[in-house]
Amino acid sequence: MSIRIAINGYGRIGRSVVRALYENNRQDEMKVVVINELAEPSAIAHLTQYDSTHGRFPFPVNLQNNLLKIKNDDIHLVRFSELADLPWHEHDIDIVLDCTGIYGSRADADAHIAAGAKKVIFSHPADPDVDATVVYGINHQQLTGDETFISGASCTTNCMVPVIDTLDKHFAIKCGTITTIHSAMNDQPVIDAYHSDLRRTRAASQSIIPVDTKLAAGIERILPKFANKFEAIAVRVPTINVTAMDLSITVSKDVTIQEINDCLLKASETNLKDILGYTEAPLVSIDFNHDPRSCIIDGTQTRVSDGNLVKLLVWCDNEWGFANRLLDTSFYLANLAEQKRLQSTETVKSLEDTGISNEIKDELQDRRKII
């Protein structure tokens, strides 16, 4: 089964998703068949092929008659500003990855479904009535396949939750604070310019700029036991990619640096392999560019004060790691849904073979259509 994906919004995350799909050779599992982006097709092709952060695309990229051609695949390029106009029916879309950063409500998800998509995954935090907010590696196994409206949380939530969850299971976290040291983003100007947030009127390359963050709320949504137990602040720094997370937690018993690091190292080699990483190499932020993991612990920076106050430095590629998790979640969800569909089909066939009444048979077929 090859999952048919549409991307709505082809910015940093959308392009990273396409690149990750091809770099990881997952085209047999998933295919991006259509991209909705208001930019000119020539610019779309150019920015797919040439990327200042991740380098040149590893395969030829060509543009022909509004088709983005990569390897043997044709990706349709469309330009619609209204969700109601999107051609998902026409392209038989299984999952829409909405990477606009704009939409996130139940009504927005319903608009995608009405346009013909079976499921919607937002690449950013969504409204509280979302069917599920998923941090892959932590709670993705709670999905049933029935969900239609999902959020992939945020890059920073995906970075922090595996670390917090792991340490809580071993040392019982009481509370914590986080400082996100995030690379500049495209909502910041190159030189001073107008913005509703006065701090973001300032040149991205000239200052460390405090910005708002909802990271604490994101952690609470995945790990409800930590309601009102975490606070977070964020600053943007003059780099183009990779984020550092300064995590401080109070645990319920005295611990040592070695115990903390051993716990995280073990997780990186077992249940969170390829999600959480661990290193003691003398690395800097650029060394984590294009790292597909959600978070990487720098064990040399772990500190313990007064026995139970723990500080950690955690890295993540806020583009590449997150894009890989979106693909992981898409594949997992679509396969769950397909398994349910097949089970429903087998049930109806079995009942037909046993001569079940047409009334019950019709009811089961109606349920199958809903699934």
Swiss-Prot record:
Pfam families: Gp_dh_C (PF02800), Gp_dh_N (PF00044). SMART domains: Gp_dh_N (SM00846). It is an enzyme of class 1 (oxidoreductase). Keywords: Cytoplasm, NAD, Oxidoreductase, Pyridoxine biosynthesis. The active site is at C155. Substrate binds at S154, C155, T156, R200, T213, K214, R236. GO terms for molecular function: erythrose-4-phosphate dehydrogenase activity; NAD binding. Pathway: Cofactor biosynthesis; pyridoxine 5'-phosphate biosynthesis; pyridoxine 5'-phosphate from D-erythrose 4-phosphate: step 1/5. The keyword Nucleotidyltransferase does not apply. Homotetramer. Catalyzes the NAD-dependent conversion of D-erythrose 4-phosphate to 4-phosphoerythronate. This is D-erythrose-4-phosphate dehydrogenase. It comes from Psychromonas ingrahamii (strain DSM 17664 / CCUG 51855 / 37).
